[in-house]
Every structure is written in structure tokens, then in C-alpha cells.
Amino acid sequence: MLSADKQGLAAFLDGHAPYFEEIADRIWEHAELSLKEYASAALYLGKLRELGFTVTEKLCGIDTAFCGSYGSGRPVIGILGEFDALSGLSQKAGETAHNPLVPGGSGHGCGHNLLGAGSLAAAAAVKAYLEQSGRPGTVIFYGCPGEEGGAGKAFMAREGLWKQLDAALCWHPGDANQVSTGTNNSCIQVLYKFSGVPAHAAGDPFNGRSALDAVELMNVGVQFLREHMTPDCRIHYAITDTGGISPNVVQAKASVLYMVRANKVADSVKLQARVDDIAKGAALMTGTSFERVFIDGTAELLPNFSIENALYANMEAIGVPSFDEDELALAAALKATYPGSGIEGIKGARENPEIRKQVLALSGNGAKPLNDFLAPRYSSTSISPGRTDVGDVS
């Protein structure tokens, strides 16, 4: 049963739901890419002021990073909001077939329109509680840009922004009501920009120094490195600039972007150093030079089982959302467009046979269009292969 304080929080959220739903819809329409979320940031800044938060813009020198705070004293609780979109995923809301708002435009494939709005709702509810109770404590909503690319939270960590917090909370839209657990890979991205000497490939090749050759030799070197990595490591690359489209020219410029992953950030740093050495070797072999441009890096997430337990207890007490017939019909239509039972994303359903048994029973063997139940409690240190800059807050 919910305490009187928690009943007040629930009533606040229910009463203000349309306000925050409208924010989510507007962010869906803005759909701005990482570190370019200018309209989205402006919308949130306006709403924070409207809600009575003290606002700080351009946190850590990042144009679209900001925060809104309320209260005084401890504990200091940070609630993280994200709002960046992904390229090429523009989509009209409520439709189950591809139908972009802007052909070729960006869209919210990861639901960050909901993530930011939901986090703001949580911060506003805590503010209302502090106002009504008169108790000490500070709540801070952080507008965190560049989660999809740019690792905004990592640069905010570099400036020591998270040190003032006693706890930080975040959430992510998904197809299950659950407490997230486990960790993820750390990651580093570096761009290598090679420079050589142009020449005619037929008439004067001996005076040319090919930057494109350097990129290709670097890629070959990394391929041979793969055998000597530990199994948890990954290396990915994309040639971002071939120098030109004329094969009869020795290309003087070429670039390649590398991403390395490992379970621990210290191991990513070691692996990245080996990739750096391969770039040096490629330049030496081709008589070229290169510029190393650090793009971003993220640490692994450190799970906090105490907070996980508190979250789960409150989710049990408050219950899961209910859905009307129209929402269930839309969910069923969406589910029909992709394979799987819809339970694959539930924590523990793959790793733990007992959890899987419970989930199958609750989901009707995966037949339900929506997972309208609270997933069983599950804590783990298992590793997700992807990355998130939330790790740099943990």
C-alpha cells in the first residue's frame, strides 16, 4: 500500500500527465540529432522555468546541456533526461508502416522523446513533494544531450558535474515494466585523418604518398590484431573519407573512424593504444602522416542493487500502466511487424530458467500485444554489448 506521501506523488503525476505528454509529442516532432538539439533544449528550458526550477544553461560549455534545480540540503537527487534522435528514422506518430514526417529525416527510434519528458515529470513530482512537506533535499533535472553520439554525460563527468549527487536516476522506454540491471561495454571512438602527397596515378605515382593506402593498411593491421584481443573486446570501423572518386589520382587525404569496446574502460584504453600504434605503422609504411581526433568515450555502467531494490518495491506498490482497446490494437499491429515473442528484452528471461518460466506465464507465452505486467525481480552483473554514457554518471 502506498504511503500518504507516495499517494500525493501519484496524484500529481496523474493530474499533470497531459502536460508532460504534450512535451513528449513536441520532442518527437523536433527529432534533433546529437549535440544539435537546440529546439528541444529550448523547449525544456522553458518548461523548467514554467515549473519553478532554477535553470542553468550551457552546462560544461555544451550548448544543449542544462539543468533545473529545486530545494536545498541533502539528499541531492539527480534525474537524467535525454532528448536526441537518430538519423533516417523520421516517422509519423501512431502509424505501423514506414511513413516519415520528413523524408530522410531523423526520428526517435529509441524513444528519447519519452525519456526526457518522463524524467522531467519525475523531477516535477519530487519538487511538489519538497514544497508540500517542507523537508530538506534537492532535486536536479539534467538535460543530457548527445547520448546517441557524442557522449554528453562523459564530458559532463569530466567537469565533475556528478560529484554533488547522492544518487542519480534514469529510465528508458521499452516494452516491459521492469527495473534495469546489469552492466554494458565501455567504448572509445577515435577518428584517424591521414595526409599524403597527391600525384597522377599513371604519370607520376612514384612521387605520390597515398593517404588512402594508409587507411587500407591500418584496416589490415587491425584485422590481424583481432586474434590477440580478449573475447569481450570488439573493434568497429567506418571509412569516412576516401579522398575522392578518381582512381587515377593518388589520394592525399583519407580518414577512418574507429570504435573499440571492452567490458572495462581500462581495457578499452589499452586496446585503443594498440589501434593507435597500428595507425602509426600505417603512416610509416606509406610515407604519410595522420591526425588523431578523439571523438568520445564512455565507461561501463556500475549497477546499484540497493537502488534497484527500492525501485522495484515502489513499482510493486504503484502498479503498472493500464491500456485501452485502441492502445492494445495499435500494439498488436506494431508487434506483427517484427519477429519474436516480445519477451526477449525482459531482464533475466534469457539467463534464468525460473524467470523465463514466470515471464512466459505472465505474457501468455508471449502472445500478449503488450507486456502489461511487472517483470519478476532480477539482479545481475551480466553485460550488454552496447554502450551508454549513463555509465559515466554511475
How would you name each of these model-derived features?
Residues 2-108, 113, 117-121, 125-138:
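Acidic/His- and Gly-rich active-site-bordering loop/insert found
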Residues 8, 12-22, 39, 43, ...:
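A non-catalytic, amphipathic alpha-helix used as a structural packing/dimerization or gating element
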Residues 27, 68, 79, 112, ...:
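Divalent metal-coordination and catalytic microenvironments
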Residues 32-33, 142-146, 295-300:
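Conserved short loop/turn motifs at secondary-structure junctions
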Residues 55-56, 139-141, 237, 290-292:
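Generic structural signal for residues in well-ordered beta-strands
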Residues 64, 86-88, 95-107, 113-114, ...:
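Histidine/acidic-residue-rich, glycine-tolerant segments that coordinate divalent metal ions
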Residues 117-125, 213-217, 392:
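Short amphipathic alpha-helical face segments that pack within enzyme cores
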Residues 216-394:
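Metal-dependent amide/peptide-bond hydrolase catalytic core
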